[in-house]
C-alpha cells in the first residue's frame, strides 16, 4: 500500500514545486493557445515557438535573435495532447510589450493556425494561474513543460 501512494506524493510534490517556480516567475499575461483541430504535440510545440518568434520580432524588431535579454519570457504547458490539444502560457514582459502583445497576438496566431484562437488575460494572481496550468503536470508528463529556447541557451552559458 505504501508503494501505491508514493507516485501520488511525488507527483504532488513535483506539481507544488512547479507552482512555486511559476509564481516566482511573476507572469504578466496568461494566454491559452487553442488549435481547434487535430495536431500532434510536436507540431503544436513548433507552432507555439514560431508564434513566440513572430511576436518578439514585432515587439523588439528584426534583431530580436541577437537580443535575448529584450525578448519576452514564458513558461508554458501542453494540455490534452490526445483530444483537444492546447497550450497554456505565462508570459513576462515589459508594460509596453504587454500592451502591444494584446493588440497583435490574435492576428499572428490566426495567420499560423487557421481557425485557432487565443484567450489573453492579465495575471492578477500568479499562484492561481500556476495552479490551473499545472493541473495535468506530473514528472511523467514533464515533456509538456515548455520554455523559450533563448532562455535555455543563455542559462547554459
Residue ranges of predicted features:
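Right-hand nucleic-acid polymerase module
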Residues: 1-85, 93-157
